[in-house]
């Protein structure tokens, strides 16, 4: 039997840090919120802060894509597998869903994380060695246009 995920509502996206990380005010209920850094799980995007100019350009592009995706959204949900789903840098690790008024619909919708993969903005990442094949990303993005 699958375990139910933990669902958190985002009151406000404070900042898109890079293509796979945001700062957000998370609604804990009872008019209580907490500002946390959230790392999108299962993805690795090109870095926007690097000396590699090709990677930097791609990193800035995916950061802009994520900003547009989250801009003016009032219904953003973070779905995690554990109640304290944090990674080694203390960031919450989860999937983002936008436009979800009903919490239960997250199980039926495609996450922002998966959209990034499908549109060629990132690599699948589940720990371990990171793969940085920029040609693969560019080819996938061209095929989705």
Report residues per predicted region.
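Small beta-barrel nucleic-acid-binding modules, primarily SNase/OB-fold domains
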Residues: 1-145
